[in-house]
Amino acid sequence: MKIPFIAIATVAICASCGPAAQNSTETRTDSATTSAVTQDQMIAPAKEIAPLPQPDTTAILFDTVTIEHPRGDTFDLYVPSGFQVAIAAHGMNRIRFMDRSADGRLFITDMLNLADNTKGKVIILEDPDSSGVFQKQSLYLDKLRNPNSLKFHKDKSGKDWLYLAMTDKLVRYPFNPGDTRPAGDAEVLDTYPDYGLSYRYGGWHLTRTIEFDDEGRLYISVGSSCNVCVEKEEVRASILVMDEDGKNRSIYAKGVRNAVGLAWTHGSLFATNMAADHLGKDQPDDAMFRVEKDRHYGWPYCYHWNGKVYADPKLDTASTKVSPHEVPGAFSYFGAHTAPLGLAWFGEHEAEDPSLKNYFLVAQHGSYSPAIGRGYSIQRVREGNPPEDFVKGFLDAKGNIHGRPCGIFSIGKDDFYFTDDKFGTLYHVYRRH
């Protein structure tokens, strides 16, 4: 399948400063009635943190690429000058996160739809043609409970596994190159609250996300059961850490309402986080954190907005367990309701182009209402600064939604995939040579 494009035209447009910058001059509403804690008043890191390499901060000039989607939609996307974006696969459903096996095939999760269901899949994509379009899609696993995240990992004995995070459990399957179905039964490593979307203490956030550190320890995020509440289950709104076999599980960090994106680089865990929805369309900020062990990141007692931390008036009582002074500052603030999901680091091994090298990329899924108009893009992120658009155009000027970015996966220098879980499409972004 070939995806036609019109000729590329360079457009001298600077990268968006992002919602966080747009909101920086807004006045506080009545919902923020307590004094704020500024970034320099927030608690210092508990340990020495390795600095990240500094990126080039030159503003991005964009090229326009017209996408003719096979579902009948034609729209423009905007990518940095010198880059291209194209459809690599389509015809799937709610595709989320991905990883590549040692034999070069791409494995991708598909949650089917927004409902709590057991019809999820893991799909294998392979045999890309000269245009980078995958010619073969095959089923690896099915009848899964909301599969969101998967990772390939070689354990300390040298055995290969495919790890898969679902609503109710974390499992792993033995894996051999060339496998078209699992090489053995699933080994259950951990289980999680599982009472459905309608149950206050057990519903809401159905996704789980996994990441490994340099020592092979496994991290998994478990979202809250509610918008704002004091949880009954300790694992809610947390990031857990455990050995690669599921043993020695402990809570790594608390107070992260829904950390869907995780990435390990330079000795630290980084996470995106979706904030609560009860304070209006302009607050609180969704954010990204450099996550430290045993820290509490505020939810439900505190929230971030415009670089400051506030006590949530809904829970600001004498029994409040966390004050704004105890909450670490964010790595970057995204603005309200951008819905940050997938997260990936692009260092010297993943990028050469200065517009991408030494930046994180974040998939901004987009606000629950297109009228709010935030997100719907891939943004580059550096510490202490608002995000900047890297791929944009999924929400057009008329309010039409052409996609909702979700997962990001690097496949080489200046070369990556990202998923659109609204229309089941995999996009390929690469630097033209």
Regions found by a protein language model. Give the residues of each.
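Hydrophobic core register within WD40 beta-propeller blades
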Residues: M98, L150, D155, I210, ...
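Short, solvent-exposed loop/turn segments at conserved positions within beta-propeller repeat blades
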Residues: E68-H69, L114-G120, A165-M166, R181-P182, ...
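Blade-edge beta-strand/turn elements of extracellular beta-propeller
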Residues: G72-H90, D127-K143, F175-R200, K232-G261, ...
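Beta-propeller domain segments
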Residues: V37-P80, T207, S225-N227, M242-D245, ...
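Bacterial signal peptide processing site
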Residues: C17-A20
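Conserved beta-propeller blade signature
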Residues: R105-T109, G158-L164, R217-S221, S268-T272, ...
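Short loop/turn segments immediately following the C-termini of beta-strands
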Residues: M111-N113, A165-K169, F175, G223-S225, ...
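Asp-box/WD-like beta-propeller blade repeats and closely related beta-sheet repeat scaffolds
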Residues: Q135-K154, D160, M166-F212, S221-S224
